[in-house]
Amino acid sequence: MNSIESSSNDSNEINKNSNKNNTHLNSNYNNIYKNNSTSSNNNNNHNNIEIIGIDNNKNNNKNNNDNNNNNNNIDKKRKDSKNKQNQEINQEMSENKKIYNSNDSNCSSGSSSGGHVNNGHHILIEENERLEHENQEIQEIYKQKGMEFQKKDLRFGYDVNSNNNNNNGGGSSSGSSSGGSDESASNQPIIRTRNREGSILNLKKQGLVKEISQRFQTPDTASYTRPNANNISIKDKISILKKEQERRKQDSEVQQREKVIVLSADSSNIQIYHPSVLIEKMNSKLDTEEKPATTTTTTTTTSTSISTSTPTTTTTTTTNTSTTNDITIKPKTSPTKNNEERSQSPITTPKQPVEEIVKKVSTPKSNNTSKKTSSDTTPTGKTTKKDKKDKKDKSRDSGNLVIVNNTNNTSSNNNNNNNNNNNNETIIKRRGRVLVTPSSDLKKNIQIYFTIPINPPVNKTNKPNQLLSNTSQQFLKTLISNEIPIDCKINDINDTDAFSDLSASASSSSFITKSSQSLLNVQSLRVKAIKTSFNILFLMPNQSKKILQVKGSDTIENLKERIISDYLFNNNSNNNNNNCKYGADSYLILDFNDNPMERSLVLNKSDYILDKRAQGLIPKLKVIEKSTILDSDPSDELSPSEYEIIRKLIPGTDTWRGEEVEYFRRVTSRLRYEALPLIKGSIQSTLLVRLSPLPIPIVGNKILISIFLPITQVTKTLDLELNETADQFTNRLFTKNYSKHLPNVNSNDFILKVVGSSDFIHGPHDIRTFESIRNHIIQGTKPQLTLIQRPKPELDPQPFKPRFDYPPELIIDHSCSNAINCNNNNTNSTNNNNINFDNWDQITHISIREIKKPFRVKVMGSTRIPLSCIKDIDSSSVIVSISLYHGIECFSKAFTQPIIPPPFAFLAETLSVDWCEWLVFTNIDYSNLPVDARLSISVYSANETVDDVEEIKNLDEATKKLTPIGWINVMITDFKYQLRQGMVELSLWPSDFSNPLGTCSNNPSSSQSVGLTLEFEEFNLPVLFPRKTKFSTSVSVIEQPPTNINSNEMREFFEQITALDPLSDLKQEKYNQLWTLRHYSILFPQVLPRLMLSVPWTQATAVDEAISLLDRWPKLKPYESLELLDAKHANRKVREFAVTCLEDLSEDELLDILLQLVQVLKYEPFHDSKLSRFLLRKAILNRNIGHSFFWYLKSDLHDSNLSERFGILLESYLYACGAHRIELLKQMEVINNLTEVAKKIKPLKDQDRREFMIKEFESLEWPKRFHLTLNPRFESNGLIINKSKYMDSKKLPLRLSFTNTDMNADPIEVIFKAGDDLRQDMLTLQMIRLMDKLWQKEGLDLKLSPYGCISTGDMIGMIEVVLNSETTAKIQKSEGGGAASAFKLDPLANWILQHNKSDMEYQKAVDTFILSCAGYCVATYVLGIGDRHNDNLMVTKGGRLFHIDFGHFLGNYKKKFGFKRERAPFVFTPDFCYVMGGKESFKFSQFVNYCCTAYNIVRKNAKLFMNLFAMMVSTGIPELQSMEDLNYLKESFSIELSDEKAREKFVALIHESLATKTTQLNNFFHHLAHA
């Protein structure tokens, strides 16, 4: 509170007080301007002085005369005390500087001088109202949680305990004045720090609130927000931004306080501001709610202390006896100072006269401030009610001051005193010294300041108007027409000539008119610039760029509607307007700091856009899909029980994390969302017919079909009419048996079902084309069907609950040469239609083609190296080798310097080595790097001393001089086509040299594996590889390829290339010639794989041209395109072209090669690829494909190299497959039960195994109904325990008999193996099945039996049992003679005759045997199947021969004591020939003819088999580890031979096999071993 004291009429007292007041006047002179100007710019600044108001009462006339007399006395003594005064002033300056600096840094937020009120008070009231609402919501939440709510006043600006803490508001030296202080302090606003303990955000973190109310969300979080890449939420980012703004605000305040004008007698040293600058800085918002100081007395209160932490309050009372032209200034003092220290000013300033200032201050306010002070105060100093009412009117006395510089100029000018006396102006004396008269320039500044209105209108902006730079002027000129030229050089603030026309006596109004005119021009330019249209650069979701012309009044929502409609329309390749259903709601707009822009935000109110425009830059915004910022975990799409099923089928899904994983999950989520309308239910999937693409078999006899009628419980046998369809057959059957008994039912209500299988026969298809019917016809058996009521397609629930709609995905395009102008949705606008994006402010990335320097990588160091890898502590060194590969081609190789670890490093358990060495690949630049290049890295130790890198290159990895430590492959790009930059931590795969075809993923056991740290070179922007589909026009390409080839030599060249097998290689000269003739090669589409191998991938222009050719290449046949998917072809575009060709495959054709397609997923560098999308979509839409897809992936899930990629694909399939996930869970439970039993019986003795196995089977709980994993068309409800047994072999497989849910069906016989790797059997049987289909397409049915086989896990799987069959070993033993029966001729013929009594049946069985024997002779020879003894060959009772147990293939025959046990090309023993009637019989000739025909048919499709084997190199099969293992196929297929030569070759092989005795001898020893 201000303590007021009445004036005294005693002249002595007046003179005393006047001198005392004048003592501080000069030192505080600059403080007046500094503090008040700072207060006008920032409402929260704290005043460092108190200004006691100017009194203009008539009662002070006498005091004025006394003051004049006293001033004359002081003038006489001035010269005597000059030196003393200078010392005192200097001391005051140094001490008060310290006080001022400390007070300025520690000042309180509340106003402590004269009751000044903060201008932000009205903002605090709004904040307090919002906090009251928040307080109520918090209290309700505590009630719901049953918790006690501790109420806290979170309001801003008011102290809750102000009544109890009176000292915080002010104090008084006497008891009589304390009451007034308490009353005023109780309502005084105090800025307080907001307590956030009870806030909504904090409650959410504690888990008490799941969702924040819309009222308390910021504009960014009110809509969808994208999670920050650094795991910082939008709310945290907003909080950080607010803190940053507050910090900048405080910095600006400090800078404003330091801006002062030099008050000096020498006008040349005075800093003169431009009038517009002065008006700009001084025309700030005034504190209209300030509490004024009284006119006669003042109480100064200090709320902070420098030396003590507890503030105390002191009050000093002075009486104003000066005239109306005088100003009394009271400085703030520290409570720890004594009275003498309190009289010192906070900042010492040069002594200068102030009479001109006094005149300017008193003149405009004399009429408004003439009030009686003596009547308004009491002797005790308390204020009256009238005084309280007039506080607001009196608050203007200390509000209008000018900015001045704070300088330490103590010089005086005696001439100023004479000038002041001549002009009859009052001279204020300080300590007996006349003050210096202000200079003319200073008077001009003061004159400008005091002519500003009391409450000038100001714009409510955070920042004052800034001066325009030359760049901004130029920017405005380009936007605004030349109606208002920018003539004012407003950035030249030091030009004093602008003030030369002004004199000290010039009126303020004339000057303000001129300065306002120049300022008006600037302001009008800015206003016009805001209203003028401007451009915004949008970065679209497909990485394309678009320019949109907008206005400042546009909102973000309007921009989004315009840009999205244009984006979807121009990217709709089919022009069918399918994209129209997706609106702007599917997208979000972000600024380039990844902050979401509020939908209702006006562009002129966006700080980001305004800042960019002020800098003359084009604003850049990002358009993203909403799905990209949502959580990629789709667990919310399923019920908890359904999600638990997925967790059981694929454990450990939560451990798969990372940016690429989250991106791939979003990709698969989009894919299943798009496929949702096409997903079929359970019944619909079951009713799908299975038609065979093979020719209809021709039989001489009638085809009989057995049908069971459940209603009448009768079995009927009908003849199949010629070309009769399934619907016609059903109608004939219904009419004959049911039409009379069921008059209200027609044949469409029934359907035929295969007994024992889930195959249905219906539709307008020839009944012989159904796969199940065709197999029965080929095998000569009678099909068994049942007539059932047609199942009604049940309303299956959706497989998942969609969370949002995905907009169409568009091709990524980083091309930025042209942009589409979206001005008013008119793409043909001539304004900015073709915009050059080469401007630096519009660059968002760097093209790899622009970096013209060698590629390099820095090897930092390696950790956790096992000591076992270091053979010799003294001489062994550790080396890192890095090779640059593209496919299987190595471009460059580099080595680090060998590092010998110091001896003390071996004291730890593991070893660490540091290189910090750049490896430069001098032969290839960044600009020529292939996008799919990879680094193959090896870390190994040299067992001998190695001096330099050249010696390392001479070492062979296969020698014993090198010990492998670990290896890994790293792509040079990431999944976004961005070049890797910065540090990369790698976890190596152990104990092997580099494998260029191996995985590119890290070892998941990173805590135990060897670590390697690399550093890739960093650039200022992301470095991207071009992904545009259209070929660059900068390269010369023949757009129209030649229509024919006139040169026979050229034609022969292409025919030779296409005739080569995929395993053969060409010389480099041939590849160069092929690339030279690339424009003609399009006439031979099959040459594409070789053409892609001839591309010089280290030449950027050649790569662009190859991609352009690929875009125009004719589509290949599906099987021909498989070669483009093996490891040799690494380019993504090439592999995507191959997948496009596979779209034409039928269901059965896709199932035939699905195993290979799943395996080549390992060759894909990243999770997301066109192949993975293709397979996932096919699996979702077809349950048969989905079943095989699931188990092919599940069987390799144990491999740590593949677990993440295969696991995410499985997870995505299970989310979309609906009820099929329940069936898969049942199958897995059955397999787990069988695996447990199979492992338990192995350590038991033979006599105990069966009894233990039966007990275990009886204790197991089987699902009520489940489909067999081996064949999902078979359905069972349990195990027939009495018929189950274990087999007498090394791995003890289980022979199991499952029940069939069909009443009249036979049991389902399978062999379950635990401990055998069935992947090789799967591959071999797949090839045999494929050969059988190829032969049947050519009309050759060789009666093969490619039984089913599937691997369900690590060394676990199932095999189908061929019923009514026996091994040739048992057949030979049944004839007697023991092991010698292996040399007998008739045992096999006698066994067939025994089961086919009649002559017709026997001849038919013999013919079947000849056909099947021919087929397996060709198949086993071509595939190089080994370990062929009489226990691996079986014959059915119908004479069908087949092979089992394919543990060796590709020519890997067994050896005994270093000798090959198998020397015959294939198994064809004399007893086989005996069944045919001998070598001279006609049937033997038939056999030879069948073999040669089958062999030539297979040779025509040799490329298919070679490609399928090549695609399986990465599976890890022991006998298929590298491409060299496939060399046997080149010999066995003999593609270079003609059909006649090949026929002669195979005839010779038949006779060679028949004459070789080692086969019979091998059978003999096998008999002995198993006797």
From Swiss-Prot:
InterPro entries: ARM-type_fold, C2_domain_sf, Kinase-like_dom_sf, PI3/4_kinase_cat_dom, PI3/4_kinase_cat_sf, PI3/4_kinase_CS, PI3K-type_C2_dom, PI3K_ABD. Its EC number is 2.7.1.137. One of its GO terms (molecular function) is protein kinase activator activity. Residues 1-73, 101-119, 294-324, 360-382, 405-424 have a biased composition (Low complexity). This is Phosphatidylinositol 3-kinase 1. Residues 325-337 have a biased composition (Polar residues). Belongs to the PI3/PI4-kinase family. Residues 1424-1432 are annotated as: Catalytic loop. GO terms for biological process: actin cytoskeleton organization; aggregation involved in sorocarp development; asexual reproduction; bleb assembly; cell migration; cell motility; chemotaxis; chemotaxis to cAMP. Residues 74-85, 283-292 have a biased composition (Basic and acidic residues). It catalyses: a 1,2-diacyl-sn-glycero-3-phospho-(1D-myo-inositol) + ATP = a 1,2-diacyl-sn-glycero-3-phospho-(1D-myo-inositol-3-phosphate) + ADP + H(+). One of its GO terms (cellular component) is pseudopodium. PANTHER family: LD28067P (PTHR10048:SF14), PHOSPHATIDYLINOSITOL KINASE (PTHR10048). Residues 1286-1292 are annotated as: G-loop. The keyword Kinase applies. Residues 1443-1469 are annotated as: Activation loop. It is an enzyme of class 2 (transferase). Residues 1-119, 157-195, 283-430 are annotated as: Disordered. Residues 1040-1216 form the PIK helical domain. Residues 1280-1558 form the PI3K/PI4K catalytic domain. Coiled coil: none annotated. Keywords: ATP-binding, Kinase, Nucleotide-binding, Transferase. It comes from the Eukaryota.
